[in-house]
Amino acid sequence: MGQKIHPTGFRLAVSRNWASRWYASNTQFAGMLKEDIEVREFLKKKLKNASVGRVVIERPAKNARITIYSSRPGVVIGKKGEDIELLKAELQRRMGVPVHVNIEEIRKPEVDAQLIADSITQQLERRIMFRRAMKRAMQNAMRLGAQGIKIMSSGRLNGIEIARTEWYREGRVPLHTLRADIDYGFSEAETTYGIIGVKVWVYKGDHLGRNDAPVVEEPQEERRKRPGRPEGRRREGEGRPAGQRRGAGAGARRGTDAKTGE
């Protein structure tokens, strides 16, 4: 199941959170969900060159708070904040409520799965060999601290007539382990031969759950004593000089007594 299911949806209740965080009645839910999808598509087209990893939408009390995670926040903000003000006005017009826009910087874009997928698709659209693009992305991710990465490309690779799928993996990517921090990204390249889909899984380590706290080892002197062995007493034979057999001292004394007759 872990190989097929969406890694983020699989871990939502364990180590991941929703990208849309709000509550709505049954009559309003579908409309608000459609609005979120349209806002994300608009931001994806508008900020195509800003390296946007993900967009989080919150709706507190007739307002909207949109957090944009980008590796190039200067492109989103623009000169003296002009671009972000225009973006905020357009979002308010689309959503019909006051909108607050926050920009969060992605410190390591080389290990962000969505940014890796977008980078590979941009290279494919520029006619770069897909194997070279995939292997270069894997090397950069492993160099910057990823514990494992898997990249899959599907479609008419290199313009061949029959579509196929190729994937490469480096390190370990435990998709069945719920506590594993798996970042997932998907992107599509629109080439002259058709669409090529790129999927990326990045393994960044394990999340510690409530019962998985690290165990501190007890000092040697405070360890519990073995059962049936009182403190301060040693077994017979412990502490003898090396090479001396058990009972050798008593036998030697008896032999001396027999010779002297004492």
UniProtKB/Swiss-Prot annotation:
Binds the lower part of the 30S subunit head. Binds mRNA in the 70S ribosome, positioning it for translation. The gene is rpsC. Belongs to the universal ribosomal protein uS3 family. Keywords: Ribonucleoprotein, Ribosomal protein, RNA-binding, rRNA-binding. NCBIfam families: rpsC_bact. This is Small ribosomal subunit protein uS3. GO terms for biological process: translation. InterPro entries: KH_dom (IPR004087), KH_dom-like_a/b (IPR015946), KH_dom_type_2 (IPR004044), KH_sf_prok-type (IPR009019), Ribosomal_S3_C_sf (IPR036419), Ribosomal_uS3_bac-typ (IPR005704), Ribosomal_uS3_C (IPR001351), Ribosomal_uS3_CS (IPR018280). PROSITE patterns: KH_TYPE_2, RIBOSOMAL_S3. Residues 211-262 are annotated as: Disordered.
